[in-house]
Amino acid sequence: DNKNAFHEIESLVAEYPMDSRYQVVLGDVYMQNGKKEEAYNMYRKVLDAEPDNAMAMYSLASYYEETGQKDLYQQQLDTLLLNKKVPSETKLDVMRRFVVQIEQDGKDSTRVISLFDRILEQEPDDAGIPMLYAQYLLSKGMNKEAFPVLRQVLAIDPTNTAARMMLLGEAVRKEDYNDVIDLCEAGVETNPE
């Protein structure tokens, strides 16, 4: 029941005023119950105190989307995904949700590709986002565009067997045996088993 949920979250916010997680959750509960202004105010309060709070950034982006403010939604999503202080795992989770949403809505993949490209310009130190991007490109039949991204995955994480195997399969298909040898030798070096 909603009344108890509100009471419980509000009491946690009062008990732990410095823990922004409860404030964001309260904003989310407000949003789920049609209290959009209260939700917005809670997200803004958290972001005023902690501008790099990924949970609040994502919730605010969701708020903009649900209230039909598409430009602000995209801007907030960019702020979250292009912020170097947001952990890679959080960005990866947000991108997964974004990709699923775009696919479910039947929207043009250029938005997804453009956002991935902008994230990768930051030279990620984690192979998760480039790997997700490569998988997305492959799912769209954009193999030519996916293979350089897979090479980027290997540059970040030489032990990434999935990326190496996809590249190896493509090299065999193209009968590029020099590339096959290079990929295999590098694979044995990084993964002797």
Name every feature range the model reports, one short phrase each:
Residues 1-193:
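Alpha-solenoid helical repeat scaffolds
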